[in-house]
Amino acid sequence: MNEGAATAVEREVASWTGVTTGDTGRGGLKLSYGKVELGHLHGDSFADLPFPKKARDELIEEERASVHPPLPNSGWMRRRMDGTGDAEAVIELFRMNYDRAKARAERSSSGADLRMNRYEG
């Protein structure tokens, strides 16, 4: 049986530590790390992902994604999924966001630990 692109993306990304899934409220499937949305899927058609604007512009220039039509001047971008091969490219984009969100959370946690240690001694 051939699984759809969205199923492949959801199965992989949801298996990463700390990732949760939920409804976007607009008919999509949201994938998050903690309180940070990594992106969301619109069925097997496309994925929308938020990136820092500079990174988004580079990914669009590299033709790995396109401008997000509803928010063309934001950091959001869109990646079409025409098959399982595209699922791998979308998973790679989610991994980039996951690594960034996880690193930010770890830095934040380390900072909190340092602040707490100052008051403990």
Give residue ranges: language-model regions:
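Charge-dense, helix-prone N-terminal extensions
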Residues: 1-121
